[in-house]
């Protein structure tokens, strides 16, 4: 399996315009156009051309240039959400820019950390602006790139990594040649077509996300990451003995469109770890892959409803003595309410006198009927429903959140039953 490594240009890719070109049009004398044309025709190296362009600008313009570029720069639609998606999926992502630190860092602040940004440095200490090049070409590149994207890729890449390059301009061509897939627009797209490089065209970062989700190597890696995450949750819950007699089922969402999620296989002892603990299900809860005899858990339809009607990323269903007793005690009320416990904060309720109510629905051997009743209580991206004498189903945006909520509810159930027993004893 190949681990994805995603490299993204900045100017004209993350931003809608090339910020260096915008700066030159606004502040530079006309000599800059000849330098720009020389870079595009490849008669002048990127490092030489860009360095000379900035050297046309007086350092005294620092504040004016900075204010101008930060005001006029626009981020391409979907970028912030794209980075959140990558972080959620654990996909390695780096911005490698031929741009300058004084505008790259501020424009990415709060979205991409500096430890994941490679760019050039502008010095304003002399009469005119001077550019420093902290990431020059290594021995494998002789193109005098400035911020050498191929060299940085070689530095970051593992032996079997699947490299994805996202870019738009002449400064991205050599990096595209080093990648397994180039997601391109404008000049770079035409170069990829001419050079016969594996590529896909994009308009904004919603397109980039879709392309990644449809790329086999990326899909395989994301699915395996989710499999490992769910396996860790299963292991922790098994250590608590929350899977008696093969009961319970767990799932985690792998992709949104089309909906795909991993779910525990039916009839398996979940206290054991095997290669066939989970299978991939589709939006109807059916196996999404062939070549195996695994069947989804009986309550898969409940998990399907969770993913169809909320933004949850993980759903957990367990049978414990405590949650079954609670559901029986309060079945007539069709709900149970807890208050006055500090652990309620684990459910995202931080008010001093917060309370939480868990709905209780009747059990049914006919899963479609059970699922229809269950669906009526799906509100928000996290929540819980007790099924009478049939355990609790909890969902959350992440596996960590869902597990934390499950632990909190089970604590409340255990506390409540012990308190009632002590109160009865002392009557």
Swiss-Prot record:
Its EC number is 4.2.1.109, 3.1.3.87. It comes from Bacillus licheniformis (strain ATCC 14580 / DSM 13 / JCM 2505 / CCUG 7422 / NBRC 12200 / NCIMB 9375 / NCTC 10341 / NRRL NRS-1264 / Gibson 46). InterPro entries: Aldolase_II/adducin_N, Aldolase_II/adducin_N_sf, HAD-like_sf, HAD-SF_hydro_IB_MtnX, HAD_hydro_PyrdxlP_Pase-like, HAD_sf, MethylthioRu-1-P_deHdtase_MtnB. Binds 1 zinc ion per subunit. GO terms for cellular component: cytoplasm. Homotetramer. NCBIfam families: DKMTPPase-SF, HAD-SF-IB, PRK06754.1, PRK09552.1, salvage_mtnB, salvage_mtnX. Zn(2+) binds at residues 317, 319. In the N-terminal section; belongs to the HAD-like hydrolase superfamily. MtnX family. In the C-terminal section; belongs to the aldolase class II family. MtnB subfamily. The lineage of its organism: Bacteria, Bacillati, Bacillota, Bacilli, Bacillales. Pathway: Amino-acid biosynthesis; L-methionine biosynthesis via salvage pathway; L-methionine from S-methyl-5-thio-alpha-D-ribose 1-phosphate: step 2/6; Amino-acid biosynthesis; L-methionine biosynthesis via salvage pathway; L-methionine from S-methyl-5-thio-alpha-D-ribose 1-phosphate: step 4/6. Residues 222-427 are annotated as: MTRu-1-P dehydratase. Its cofactor is Zn(2+). This is Bifunctional enzyme MtnB/MtnX. It catalyses: 5-(methylsulfanyl)-D-ribulose 1-phosphate = 5-methylsulfanyl-2,3-dioxopentyl phosphate + H2O; 2-hydroxy-5-methylsulfanyl-3-oxopent-1-enyl phosphate + H2O = 1,2-dihydroxy-5-(methylsulfanyl)pent-1-en-3-one + phosphate. Pfam families: Aldolase_II (PF00596), HAD (PF12710).
């Amino acid at each position: 399996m190949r681990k994805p490594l995603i490299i993204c240009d900045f100017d004209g890719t993350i931003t809608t315009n090339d910020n260096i070109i915008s700066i030159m049009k606004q502040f530079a004398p006309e000599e800059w156009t000849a330098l720009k044309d020389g870079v595009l025709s490849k008669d002048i190296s990127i490092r030489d051309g860009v360095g000379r362009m900035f050297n046309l600008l007086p350092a005294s313009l620092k504040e004016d240039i900075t204010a101008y570029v930060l005001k006029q720069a626009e981020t391409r639609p979907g970028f912030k959400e794209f980075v959140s998606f990558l972080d959620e999926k654990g996909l390695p992502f780096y911005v490698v820019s031929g741009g300058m630190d004084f505008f790259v860092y501020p424009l990415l602040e709060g979205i991409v950390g500096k430890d994941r940004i490679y760019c050039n440095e502008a010095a304003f200490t002399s009469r005119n602006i001077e550019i420093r090049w902290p990431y020059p070409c290594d021995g494998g590149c002789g193109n005098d790139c400035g911020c050498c994207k191929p060299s940085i890729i070689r530095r970051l890449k593992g032996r079997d990594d699947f490299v994805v390059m996202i870019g738009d301009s002449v400064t991205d061509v050599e990096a595209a040649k080093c990648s397994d897939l180039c997601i391109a627009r404008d000049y770079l797209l035409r170069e990829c077509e001419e050079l016969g490089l594996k590529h896909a065209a994009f308009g904004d970062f919603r397109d980039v996300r879709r392309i990644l989700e449809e790329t086999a190597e990326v899909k395989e890696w994301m699915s395996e990451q989710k499999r490992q995450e769910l396996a860790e949750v299963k292991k922790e819950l098994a250590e608590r003995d929350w899977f008696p007699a093969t009961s319970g089922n767990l799932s985690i969402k792998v992709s949104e469109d089309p909906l795909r999620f991993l779910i525990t296989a039916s009839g398996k002892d979940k206290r054991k770890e095997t290669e066939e603990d989970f299978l991939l299900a589709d939006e109807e809860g059916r196996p999404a892959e062939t070549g195996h005899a695994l069947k989804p858990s009986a309550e898969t339809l409940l998990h399907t409803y969770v993913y169809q009607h909320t933004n949850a990323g993980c759903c957990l269903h367990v049978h414990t003595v405590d949650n079954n007793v609670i559901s029986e005690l309060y079945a007539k009320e069709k709900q149970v309410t807890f208050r006055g416990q500090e652990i309620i904060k684990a459910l995202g309720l931080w008010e001093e006198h917060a309370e939480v109510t868990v709905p209780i629905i009747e059990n049914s051997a006919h899963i479609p009927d059970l699922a229809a009743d269950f669906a009526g209580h799906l509100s928000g991206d996290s929540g819980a429903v007790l099924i009478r004498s049939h355990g609790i189903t909890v969902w959350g945006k992440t596996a960590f959140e869902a597990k934390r909520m499950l632990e909190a509810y089970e604590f409340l159930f255990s506390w409540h039953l012990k308190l009632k027993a002590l109160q009865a004893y002392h009557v």
